[in-house]
């Protein structure tokens, strides 16, 4: 199923019983978070708060609160089908020429999909039906949530920030939280390695003192939103990838005040600039770790224009101790990661990011081990191949007889196949999540690899244990008489 815009997605979710409208007045201050959190933890529907207190604009929450809705947003029928998205990305990351006519025929669907990659530029767009400038620019009219009691201020959470480096052909779409600090000002919290921050740094180097243009889209279509959080190759724009997911070109329009292209169907667009010498203390905020993060200075985004559709819908979320919406996104995107990793490391059988590990801080890998030290090669590969795993603190590698998604299996492998001194790899002074207050230095910490595989000659001189397995014939005979035994 494909969706042309957010409203189309809302209609189809509602038809499937995957969205509930809430007409009762609900406060954007804390109440929406509590309702959305309870709903998400119960595996419930997306929520459309039609009457947020003190605002005329409805709020859409918990949109991607189940892996199934993430899959739907990516145009797939099931979570399992997301592996096909991963295979497509793996191919686009390292394309191979067809090996013959048969291979060419098999790749034809991919080539057809590629035709949907270029964005379609419109001259008029729904996102610019209403244009606000000057004193009419007022962020307080948008029902921005304050999510937790200790949060410093309301926080824009689902904004797609559009940036462009001075030497780059394509734009970057990134999702960075933005603290509201005034009628027309937000704090742009982007970490130093993220695309927007890199673009801004290059701009400062080549255009010293000049304001940096930025546009932020709120309420884009699901393919574009999810394209911004998916590990697309550096040579592929998020708009192009969204076109692949949607099966139709992404429609964009030039911002009114700058040359950046924004999703034409977005509900709201904030346009403005970042002054190179203006920063402000951001936070504290409750984050996906389950803790409040420390206060730090980040650039200030000054909004000069707000454009929006008639009767716009504000798309919002919250972050907190897993499960939260980012954790659910992680569960779904996990299926996209697997084929990408397998293309580079065919020995990998499965890859799992436990949601309770804050989506990316721990990874469990199962593999077909072939030689001594093989598990360590896979560890290093996970840390280095995709930048999404730059901040993964713990990598556990097991054999393919272990279910990576079953902690009973994983803990059994760790406690029976590991010697802590021999099978633990420690690496110090590596990039680490800025939000990780457990690291000794902000942004710099250690990583641990755990080799929970069966050991080969060269790794041990001892006789290795053989797993206990019941005789298949006995199991079948007991299966045949089990019901008659009346045990349970």
Curated annotation (Swiss-Prot):
EC numbers on record? 4.1.1.98
Q: What class of enzyme is it?
A: lyase
| Topology in membrane | Peripheral membrane protein
Would the keyword Cell membrane be found if you checked this record's keyword annotation? yes
* Origin superkingdom: Bacteria
Major place of residence: membrane
* Residues given in the record as prenylated FMN binding sites: 175-177, 189-191, 194-195
For this UniProt record, give its keywords in alphabetical order, as a comma-separated list. Cell membrane, Decarboxylase, Flavoprotein, FMN, Lyase, Manganese, Membrane, Metal-binding, Ubiquinone biosynthesis
Catalytic residues of the enzyme? 287 (proton donor)
* SUPFAM superfamilies named in the record: FMN-binding split barrel, UbiD C-terminal domain-like
Keyword Flavoprotein listed: yes
Q: Name one Pfam family in it.
A: UbiD_N
Cellular component GO terms, alphabetical = cytosol; plasma membrane
The note on the cofactor says: Binds 1 prenylated FMN per subunit.
Q: Where is the protein localized?
A: Cell membrane
Q: Which reaction does it catalyse?
A: a 4-hydroxy-3-(all-trans-polyprenyl)benzoate + H(+) = a 2-(all-trans-polyprenyl)phenol + CO2
- Pathway(s) of this molecule: Cofactor biosynthesis; ubiquinone biosynthesis
Q: Which cofactor does it need?
A: prenylated FMN; Mn(2+)
Subunit info here reads:
Homohexamer.
Q: Which family does it belong to?
A: Belongs to the UbiD family.
Q: What does this protein do?
A: Catalyzes the decarboxylation of 3-octaprenyl-4-hydroxy benzoate to 2-octaprenylphenol, an intermediate step in ubiquinone biosynthesis.
Protein name, UniProt field: 3-octaprenyl-4-hydroxybenzoate carboxy-lyase
Per UniProt, what is the name of the gene that codes for the protein in this document? ubiD1
């Amino acid at each position: 199923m494909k969706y042309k815009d957010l409203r189309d997605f809302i209609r189809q979710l509602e038809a499937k019983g995957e969205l509930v409208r809430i007409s009762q007045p609900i406060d954007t201050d804390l109440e929406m978070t509590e309702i959305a959190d309870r709903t998400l933890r119960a595996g419930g529907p997306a929520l459309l708060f039609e009457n947020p207190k003190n605002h005329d604009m409805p709020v859409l929450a918990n949109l991607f609160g189940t892996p199934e809705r993430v899959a739907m947003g990516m145009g797939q029928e099931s979570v399992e089908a997301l592996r096909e998205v991963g295979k497509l990305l793996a191919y686009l990351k390292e394309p191979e020429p067809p090996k013959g006519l048969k291979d060419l025929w098999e790749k034809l669907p991919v080539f057809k999909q590629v035709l949907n990659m270029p964005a379609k530029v419109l001259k008029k767009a729904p996102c610019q039906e209403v244009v606000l400038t000057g004193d009419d620019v007022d962020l307080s009219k948008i029902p921005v949530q304050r999510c937790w009691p200790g949060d410093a201020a309301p926080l824009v959470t689902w904004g797609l920030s559009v940036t462009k480096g001075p030497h780059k052909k394509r734009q970057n779409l990134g999702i960075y939280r933005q603290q509201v600090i005034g009628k027309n000002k937000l704090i742009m919290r982007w970490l130093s390695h993220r695309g927007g921050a890199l673009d801004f740094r290059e701009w400062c180097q080549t255009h010293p003192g000049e304001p940096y243009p930025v546009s932020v889209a709120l309420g884009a279509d699901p393919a574009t939103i999810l394209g911004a959080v998916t590990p697309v190759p550096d040579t592929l724009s998020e708009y192009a990838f969204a076109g692949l997911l949607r099966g139709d070109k992404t429609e964009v329009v030039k911002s009114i005040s700058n040359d950046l292209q924004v999703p034409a169907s977005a509900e709201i667009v904030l346009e403005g600039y970042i002054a190179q010498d203006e920063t402000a203390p951001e936070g504290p905020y409750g984050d996906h770790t389950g803790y409040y993060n420390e206060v730090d200075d980040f650039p200030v985004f000054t909004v000069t224009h707000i454009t929006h559709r008639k009767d716009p819908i504000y798309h919002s979320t919250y972050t907190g101790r897993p499960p939260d919406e980012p954790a659910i996104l992680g569960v779904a995107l996990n299926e996209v990661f697997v084929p990408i990793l397998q293309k580079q490391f065919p020995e990998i059988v499965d890859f799992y990011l436990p949601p309770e590990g804050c989506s990316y801080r721990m990874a469990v890998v199962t593999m077909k081990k072939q030689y001594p030290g093989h598990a360590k090669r896979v560890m290093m590969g996970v840390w280095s191949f995709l930048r999404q795993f730059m901040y993964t603190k713990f990598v556990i590698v097991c054999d393919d007889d272990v279910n990576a998604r079953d902690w009973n299996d994983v803990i059994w492998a760790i406690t029976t196949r590991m010697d802590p001194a021999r099978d633990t790899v420690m690496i110090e002074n590596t990039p680490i999540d800025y939000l990780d207050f457990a690291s000794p230095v902000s942004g710099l910490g250690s990583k641990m690899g755990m080799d929970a595989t069966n050991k080969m000659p060269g790794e041990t001189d001892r006789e290795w244990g053989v797993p206990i397995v019941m005789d298949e014939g006995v199991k079948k005979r007991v299966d045949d008489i089990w019901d008659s035994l009346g045990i349970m």
